[in-house]
Amino acid sequence: MKLGLCLPPFHPPAPVDMALAGANALGVDSLWTFDHLLGIFHPELYPDIGLSEIVPDPDGLFDPFCLAAWAGRSTEAPLGVAVTDGLRRAAPDVARSALSLQHLCRGGFNLGVGSGEAENLLPFGYSFDRPVSRTEEFLAVLRHLLDSGRMPDGPGRLGLPLESDAGRPRVWVAAHRPRMLRLTGRYADGWLPVDVTSPDQYRRLKTTVAGHAAATGRAEPESGLFVFLVLGDSRDRVREMFEAQPMAKLFALWMAPESAWNRYGIENPAGRSERAFIDIIPHELDAARLRDFAPSIPFELIEEYTFLGNPAEVAERLAAFAAAGLEHPVILNLTGMAGGLDEAMARGTEMEELGRAVRAMTTTTVPATAHA
């Protein structure tokens, strides 16, 4: 199985340098970063989260395309953005950026696209209306530009070569629900979900994507998974880390949908949403209420959306996804979120161990189901 790592796109650059050096030592198959204008933690509470020892401002986020260009000269691995959206970026601009980075990065470029998140749109004056319909329009133009160098209509064209020595830029789509899964099969070279909590769910969604690809005469997209990772000596040690840093538990506020909170009989102070991170804007919530609420968040709920424990424990869980068809996990190491600088620095060898285990895994082929 391939291994991708996500570079933290936070100021200052030193942690990014460290992550890049570690990734090169691991010999990863891909490097990515994410495209956020706001971070996921309330700024008033952030000083009480371990990550603040490493990153001083949760909203101090570099532009991902600039970061990819900077990092792409220091590694043979392809760089990627996981993910941007077509609600605040126009397809011709993104296509030009993707082609530019395909040539500027030694290993080429992976372009991840999603349907947008409220926190990156509404506070900055962007519309969040019709996100999936607008994403479909975006992908249609983007695909045409990357395949032909021209707009679907009119004289608009991009003069950059469509290929580098590393090939063509590859489009990945973050999809979880029927319409976006259809768009993945129709337009994407890769599928990169984040909100998948079980191998059975992963297998079902992968089969759907493959069916849509087959129905449009395209090859099945490569199957990825964006993985949030917290390493420790054991699962029990990670539990202790979160109990000692309860504000870090607010990560679940961003990831878990209403149905997950309902299973634990807890009312989510962020409101009722089955789409969780798509709808939630943490900065708009009452900080005092969140501070009181955080200690009550069950560790088991965090575990549903985070791969945590020692390398053997994490590898066992990832192996179940490999058996469901996972080909290319993209791992964001969030150990510092709960453990702070000491835990983050102490887990270098464990990350290497996990990387070796992932690379040794074999992906199980999952047959496609045709879709009209």
Regions found by a protein language model. Name each.
Residues 128-162, 202-320, 362-372:
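An alpha-helical appendage that flanks or caps ligand/catalytic pockets
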Residues 1-74, 169, 368-372:
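N-terminal beta1-alpha1-beta2 module of alpha/beta enzyme domains
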Residues 32-62, 85, 117, 122, ...:
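Glycine-rich, proline-tolerant flexible connector loops at the mouths of alpha/beta enzymes
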Residues 27, 35, 71, 101, ...:
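Conserved, mostly hydrophobic/aromatic
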Residues 3-14, 82-92, 166-176, 229-232, ...:
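Active-site mouth loops of central-metabolism enzymes
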Residues 3-7, 31-33, 79-82, 109-113, ...:
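Hydrophobic faces of well-ordered beta-strands that scaffold small-molecule active sites
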Residues 49-80, 141, 347-364:
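Alpha-helix-loop-beta-strand connector modules within alpha/beta enzyme cores
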Residues 12-23, 94-97, 174-183, 311-320:
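Short, acidic/polar
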